Amino acid sequence: MKNWKKAIALVASAAALVSVAACGSSNAGGSSDSGKKTVGFVAVGPEGGFRTANEKDIQKAFEDAGFDLTYSPTQNNDQQKQIQAFNKFVNDEVDAIILSSTEDSGWDDSLKKAAEAEIPVFTVDRNVDVKDAEAKKAIVAHIGPSNVWCGEQAAEFVNKNFPDGANGFILEGPAGLSVVKDRGTGWGNKVASNVKVLESQSANWSTDEAKTVTAGLLDKYKSDNPQFIFAQNDEMGLGAAQAVDAAGLKGKVKIITIDGTKNALQALVDGDLSYVIEYNPIFGKETAQAVKDYLDGKTVEKDIEIESKTFDAASAKEALDNNTRAY
């Protein structure tokens, strides 16, 4: 089917070819004018330090590997724009699609189209929840760190530092995202029975929103002596730290965050944060290699987990002093 369409494309009008090139897409059949394999990257777009580092790393890795990658970011977690970009890549008959989804559901129809067109899909960072059996066939592999592991590390830090139990809060990302669910699952897997979460609220990955939410929670639960805040990303943790400082509680409330950006590590060194769990964004090479291997007919692992680490103040200072952080 794809070969037949490619033959038709070779006799298409020059105007049509110019139109396709102008919108940054591939020619029918999957190969660009340069002869490179074409890849469509359905991306989240601007969303903080992790996202910027991750998406730049993926783009660079595919360029270095000799692919013709088209980057299509959305804005404000707009899933409909992502779906439109995904479907356009299918219609353009790219050789592969990289999907970093804003939502974990709602992808069945698009993935089914990709499966029918025999276009392999590689999910990165966030998993998608697919019900349709045909749609599932499109997904070759998932590449990214383990969000469950990150949540488990947060719980184990609280358990270790509060063996007699503690009260605290959880600041979550936007509702419905697999990353939010998985980090919450990890927390639940490991947290001790004498650790009480007074309330969980979404602060939508935002520093400003987290500052406001945390200030309200600290006031609401003042009599419960909150001792920890688990923020599901660095930006929210930094906002929580501002609220804790404003309330005169710096050093009395431990703040745990996930991502491992330079700003968070510096805040850890400065004593504003207590523990930072890395969610390693640098896996462009692994993603490009998985796509290349699959297109070359090789077997690819279904779940390619990227290793991450944890930081206390000492290891954060070492990482910053050595300038080893890419984000």
Swiss-Prot record:
Keywords: Cell membrane, Lipoprotein, Membrane, Palmitate, Signal, Sugar transport, Transport. Gene3D superfamilies: 3.40.50.2300. A lipid is attached at residue 23 (S-diacylglycerol cysteine). Pfam families: Peripla_BP_4. It is a lipid-anchor. It comes from the Bacteria. CDD domains: PBP1_galactofuranose_YtfQ-like. Residues 1-22 form the signal peptide. Induction: Induced specifically and reversibly by fructose both in a time- and dose-dependent manner. Also induced by ribose or xylose, but not by glucose. The keyword Lipoprotein applies. Its main location: membrane. GO terms for molecular function: carbohydrate binding. Disruption phenotype: Mutant is unable to grow on fructose as sole carbon source. GO terms for cellular component: plasma membrane. It is found in: Cell membrane. A lipid is attached at residue 23 (N-palmitoyl cysteine). The complex is composed of an ATP-binding protein (FruK), two transmembrane proteins (FruF and FruG) and a solute-binding protein (FruE). Belongs to the bacterial solute-binding protein 2 family. Part of the high-affinity ABC transporter complex FruEKFG involved in fructose uptake. Can also transport ribose and xylose, with lower affinity. Binds fructose, ribose and xylose, with fructose as the preferred substrate. This is Fructose import binding protein FruE. The lineage of its organism: Bacteria, Bacillati, Actinomycetota, Actinomycetes, Bifidobacteriales.
